Amino acid sequence: MPPIYVLQQGAKLCINNRRLCIEYEGETLTSVPLAHVSQVVLFGNISLTTPAIDALLAQNCEVVFLSQRGGFRGRLV
């Protein structure tokens, strides 16, 4: 599965029914079955719920944090 890139500033990643959901201003922009996620790349001001972090780590998904312009900030493995 290719990485999931999230660029929408202010977006939030959460888990709903074993799906990784990307929400913005209370609306779900998209969702992907958690089983199809191998890596998530976040650009800038993106938040993750604790259940999303737990689910991604349990699935051995890498989460990469970048600045809005793509500078490396860190990662969860």
Spans of features found by a protein language model:
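N-terminal intrinsically disordered, cationic/polar leader segments
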Residues: 1-77
